Amino acid sequence: MLGDRVRATRYFAYSGEVAIAALVVAVIGLMILPLPTPMIDTLLGINITLSVVLLMVTMYVPDSISLSSFPSLLLFTTLLRLSLNIASTKSILLHAEAGHIIESFGELVVGGNLVVGLVVFLIITTVQFIVIAKGSERVAEVGARFTLDAMPGKQMSIDADLRGGNLTADEARRKRARLAMESQLHGGMDGAMKFVKGDAIAGLVITMVNILAGIVVGVTYHGMTAGDAANRFAILSVGDAMVSQIASLLISVAAGVMITRVANENETRLSSLGLDIGRQLTSNARALMAASVLLACFAFVPGFPAVLFLLLAAAVGAGGYTIWRKQRDISGTDQRKLPSASRKGAKGEAPHIRKNAPDFASPLSMRLSPQLAALLDPARLDQAIESERRQLVELLGLPFPGIAIWQTESLQGMQYEVLIHDVPETRAELENTDDMQAALARQAISPLHARAHLFVGIQETQWMLEQVAVDYPGLVAEVNKAMPAQRIADVLRRLLEERIPVRNIKSILESLVVWGPKEKDLLMLTEYVRCDLGRYLAHTATAGTGQLPAVMLDHAVEQLIRQSIRATAAGNFLALPPEQANQLVEQVERIVGDHAQHPLAVVASMDVRRYVRRMIEARLTWLQVYSFQELGSEVQLQPIGRVVV
């Protein structure tokens, strides 16, 4: 199948090359050689066919770049028409005939009245020259100038996207090639429109010359009277001019359509001018209804055909009403949607409360009982989720992972269940109150605060890097060279695991650029990043007071922990015997129990801090563990107890 397509493409491409070469030879031959009238009829038919085909093609191309050969086509079709004018002029003046097409056009337009025929011809020529050709020429000039003026900015935008990682090298190369083709096309169209304008002028001059010369030739060489010569040669001259002008008019319209086409970024290869016009004209139902009322008013104007305008008003009004109903249905569907429940940076349709579970597990999801789902107000729930999202970003800087909500028959009454990666986190029953939407949103988003590290992966990290690259493209480029996105995500996860926000992503990335190439151990790399965030950690630990009541570790305890660290291929871990670990944790519990105050923390050396935190987090989740290095000299420690062996 693919081979057949390739062969067909090559065949048509080869045929196109032969056709263009034959056209150039034919143009030269038409200017020199006399042609029989059947051949003139054939060539005139081909000329009209080319004009119609070209007009239809311009109506269906999605953008002007898709027909980049259009300026050359304008040149060739103009030369073909002018050469046909020369050939038909020779036939008219030499033989007083030029084939059936020209004579039929002449008799049809003239209609037995030479004055009427000339007036019709002049009107068509004027419309083409003053309205279509002149307007298209102006649009081509402005389009060429604006395209050339905008080119440096577009090139800089492509370079910035390439540096920021938004484009690959191949994509950037294609965009630059398309930009160059676009500038060449508009420049070519600016010049090619001069051919169209000149063709209209030439057609008018040739017709006048043909009529005057025809009268002279008819009287002098054919023995006709002046009246017969004027009638005969006027019919042929006007017919010749009309054949050329009709084809020229179609080409002018095609050129106008081509250069006035405005393509948007959402168009596909199947887009066309007709689809765009139909979609845009029928996008506003109120406009159609207003037009229907105005048409109905015309029906009551004295002398106007009332039935006609009433029928038109009814047709337009019916169309407007149909569009309004569709928009209302879509609006009703949109009101049931929850845009705030979508993932940060997600594209496509907004989520809604589904009837069934989604095909794949979501990072965060909620199941509702049918009774609870029926009582919820989607608009108020959307506002509540949006409020919780803003708080999440403000507190942690975490991109919202999205939440999938659906009904299930396994829950009864007003029950709901929150799941993290399809694992149930909480199940409760909601009271039917005025603020139940806010309560439900709060319960749904709360796992993001407690387990934020579970919602950061490569995709979220990549999205954060793309956002930072808008303002700091150089920094993102350096951190991408220093380490892969997966390693950056690991560091962010470990920070969030200890409730350290990633809002200050710029400082985190700068720290990774410095320490990433030097430190291969992920735990120590995270400790270095924490040290670079020391100013923030010191402020948070002391609540802005500069003083921190602290549980200290004896040197022997720290040495015991260091000796119990085991290195494996999967990473380092603490191999402290359970009874010793339990004794140490109990000492910490006794100390903090006697000094219940806030702020309060455990302070240890940087190399053992993480293992101390891991040891106590199961029983003292709220208690933070800091290192001396990250707190620095600005924090005044107030020891409240010491853990010993």
UniProtKB/Swiss-Prot annotation:
Region (Disordered): 334-354
PROSITE patterns (UniProt xref): FHIPEP (PS00994)
UniProt entry tagged with the keyword Nucleus: no
Biological process annotations from GO: protein secretion; symbiont-mediated perturbation of host programmed cell death
Pfam families reported for this sequence: FHIPEP
InterPro entries (UniProt xref): FHIPEP_1, FHIPEP_3, FHIPEP_4, FHIPEP_CS, T3SS_FHIPEP
Family: Belongs to the FHIPEP (flagella/HR/invasion proteins export pore) family.
Protein name (record): Protein hrpC2
Gene name for this UniProt entry: hrpC2
